[in-house]
């Protein structure tokens, strides 16, 4: 069962026309990581991504399929960090390919959550990240010092991908940064909501709650995601 493949495919289709740069992942490129949350005061900031009423979206799609190749890379849609001069719309999307999700259904669910939680282990120097899991928003406040020291999406992306290397069975990561104002950020926000809905549905299924398909609130997802209905009925039967 590939929970996120439809969203992953739609994301690639939507953003392909906006790609401005692609960089192969090199761990030597990684921007310094402080290992803890950093405070960037307003008086020290250059600008914010996803702040001050601008869209700010983040989500992670995991697949075992071949829609992603085996090369990890950072992909930019829009201007790079040194080129941005004011608060900007922003999205950061991780497309993760693994060779397999191992173990029981519960084990596989935990592996999906682990991939989604990698973002909480990345602390680029000179960046204050504020992530809201409830709304799938991400805001990034950049310091002027980081801009002066040469921060870029290529280097920040390498920092993120380095953190993903701890995932079991990892094949590749496509780390997308989006800053082009012409991108449909509402569509990306809807995709983020869809990712979270699938994770929530899988969690509900694994709890073993019995259900009547005709009245179940997850019926649209079961209709859309191949294998989800069978998994749901199996766990309801075993509850």
Name each model-derived stretch.
Residues 1-64:
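Charged, amphipathic alpha-helical stretches
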Residues 47-146:
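N-terminal accessory interaction module
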Residues 140-203, 214:
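A broadly conserved sequence feature marking short terminus-proximal activation segments
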Residues 237-239:
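Long, charge-rich boundary regions
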